[in-house]
Amino acid sequence: MDKTYADTVRLLLTVAPDVFANDIFAIKGGTGINLFGQNMPRLSIDIDVVYLPWQLPRDEALRAINQELAAIGERVQPLGLQTRRICAKDLGETKLIVENETSQVKVEVNVVFRGTVLPVEHRPLCAKASDLFGVEFELPILAQDELYAGKLVAALDRQHPRDLFDVWQLYESGGITDGMVECFVVYLAGHNRPTPEVLLGNDKDLAAEYDRAFVGMTELPCSLETLLEARARLRQELPRRLTAAQKQFLCGLARAVPDWFLLQCRHAAEMPALRWKLSNLETFRKRRPSDFSAQAALLEAGLNRV
């Protein structure tokens, strides 16, 4: 593993307990998978977090997120670290950069997908990371099915080699569960891009990103061809794994008339990301009805083919 990446993980593990000192955040994404869910098959250099109180109104939630990021900055200052907060348009401060002389870690809150599908768990740092970096602690983390659901959406959407590596490792360790698929449907429904573009979209060229931002991160060798095979398998498998109820829900949402009772998550209709998605679809239907219908038909046709 590359020393620069390892130094970044060391910084990440230094600040992680302060990031989760209060009970409003839980860890998600690659750091949750590789440092807590698995035994560090690859390094992970960012802290992606979910804001847990999904019932709060948007403005109140954003204020709480901004305040907690500021508090984290204050908590890590005695460690001799520098921090700066990054503002996003109309959202306030949603990212915190933590730096020392050699490394930088980004703490980023998903301000749209607030709340969780499943109850949060607490897990210890994996044994390999604990031994290598000499620390032990546990953090609040998304449940395994939900942790991978977000990763599956990311792997189809941005298609970063890191995401596809995590998918490959998932296949190596047992594969996609029905619970992951159910959570995946919720995360796909709350995603900012149109559902057919994510689920049935085009493949990106990964070669440059593989060399620039992936090589040196993994414990095991992993070729570009391996990642491409994992992506192809994922694209083929996920649409076929959807149940009739899940397909019906996604098609109903695409026409802005979702049947929420088709989902196992009883509070899905109240989750901010899904409410926002439905609101945007209703606006899309009013302003561009032909494009709206075409997008829904594209999803229906794609799901009917599998």
Q: Can you say where each PLM-predicted feature lies in the sequence?
A:
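Compositionally biased terminal segments of proteins
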Residues: 1-306
